[in-house]
Amino acid sequence: MIPVINKRDTGLNICRLMDKYKLTVRDVQKYLELGSQQSIYHWLNGISMPTIDNLYVLSYLFGVTIDDIVCGNRPEYIIKIFIVNHIG
């Protein structure tokens, strides 16, 4: 199986990180210097993915690696999602 990125889980992960640091969509928009909030809502809802540049900035904002933000179907991602969702 070819590894693929799961946009929905990645969006949920971004949402979780925003909640952890008590950041609003507006806060992230300002930090990324985006013209509107629509892109961020698309990420959070799994409609689209942040660009690699935005992922890089988000990783800095949240103090994590890009791999910690992006979720896919590789076994280590599936285990990580289970742990976050069920164990905390």
What are these regions (language model features)?
Residues 1-23, 31:
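A short, Lys/Arg-rich alpha-helix, primarily the initiator
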Residues 14, 28-29, 40-43, 69:
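Conserved hydrophobic/aromatic packing and binding residues within compact polymer-binding modules
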